[in-house]
Amino acid sequence: MRSALSLKPSNGNAAKSQAVNNKNVIKNAPLGGKLTRQIGTSNLLQQALPSKKIDESPIIKIDAKDSFKVFEDQEPEKENSSENVDATEKDSNVIPAEDNNMIHELERKMEEKSRAEKLKFKFMQTRDNSDITSRFSEPPSEFSVLCDDDDCDKVSVASSTFTTSVRATFSSFHFDENQRKKEFGKEEAVKKIQKKAAKEARDDSMFSSEEFFPDIIKYMLHRQTKNRASHECFDIQSQVNEEMRTILIDWFSDVVKEYNFQKETFHLAVSLVDRALSMFNIDKMRFQLVGTTSMMIAVKYEEIFPPEIEDFALITDNTYRVPDILLMERFLLGKFDFVVAMPTSSWFGTCFAKRMNFTKKMRNTVHYLLELSLIDVHFLRYRPSDIAAAACCFANLQADVESWPQKMVDDTGISTEDFVDVLRDLHRMYLNASTADFKSIFYNYSETAQMEVALLPAPTDKLRSMFPSIFVTAPKSSNDSSSPQ
């Protein structure tokens, strides 16, 4: 309840007119349940108070209303409170419903926040017939598992036999770390097999395509003549010699076998080392660093799952640190002008073997000969395509197949006269591999996994019959087919 206070100024006429205005405001007040504030005004500050006289009435007069009304607020709606706005909202003296329901709006928001907090910790409540951990390899509990996967998101009341919370159950749950590693290793192995199978399928489709193969082989034969290493690269070297290069490549073979790298990675790494030897003088204390960095670059380019850079520092027995390898990588890539991919004899060998439908044993023989050619620096004088063609011819003769079919001559433009000298040097390397000083490649291809192709006899008699002027004085060894068995 409110009573109106009105200020009566010394000027009776002004007070009278003000009282009339106040009554009009009260009469015109809306009856929609809204309280209006009656504002009294005074002109005491506007006019100076006259001197007090005995006969005049007091300055301030308290008038009490004869009647008054009490208005109550309506019940606020929970949802659409903003719709409960009076039609006379334009009137500046009327307070909107939003302001009157502010407390209710805050209470509603607090309730919503409380419900959200309860849903957030919903998983902490117990269940009566199911538990999340029942899906794992934990011993069976006292409760029965009768729920579906959809029921796992529902909250149930705890039963008398199972009152432990899910959080407490998870606290006692543990994974088998070794089992997890085994499963992860199996997944990685499956991924590698799938990636390798996909790559082989792409290679088969590329090499067997009669539409695209002529353009592909023409382009690769042209590319092999660009950025080639020189067989005279050691003429500019003052501290590194051919024996050190042979030791490095023999070590490469062990690294490739240890990490199960692709054969193309091995050939590309050797190609990068030879290009570095042809470009600048290398200090012997940094030669292994150049080789390690070249292997890392080749691995990044060829492998699907390359090892970490720390592994390359580890294979050097921490002789070189990671910053040293990264610095050398920047240096080599700058020297190569970032041209890394080059056609190698491994690429041509794979291409020719697929075109001639080689067996696995014949393919292993081809790759064995190609890796032997990496050891001798004098093979740098031959083109990679000629080395690959000679290796395929050698494998055909060893398997009693036509040495170099006319179809390959038509497809590649390479004839036997182009690689007869290469074939002679490959035959020599094949015979001397078992007695060489560095036998890593020989031992690798003498294993059962490689079908022991390094132990097969060389087709010396067939080579002599085909090229009598070249293989007249061919040496004999335990691998020679013409030697007594």
Swiss-Prot record:
Annotated PANTHER family: CYCLINS
Cited Pfam families: Cyclin_C (PF02984), Cyclin_N (PF00134)
What domain of life? Eukaryota
The entry sums up its family as follows: Belongs to the cyclin family. Cyclin AB subfamily.
Q: What is this protein called?
A: G2/mitotic-specific cyclin-A1
Phenotype upon loss of function:
Homozygous mutants are not viable. Partial loss-of-function mutation bc416 causes cell division defects with a reduction in the number of dividing NSM neuroblasts and some embryonic lethality.
Query: Where expressed (tissues)?
Result: Expressed in the cell lineages ABarp, C and E as well as the NSM neuroblasts.
> What gene name is listed for this protein?
cya-1
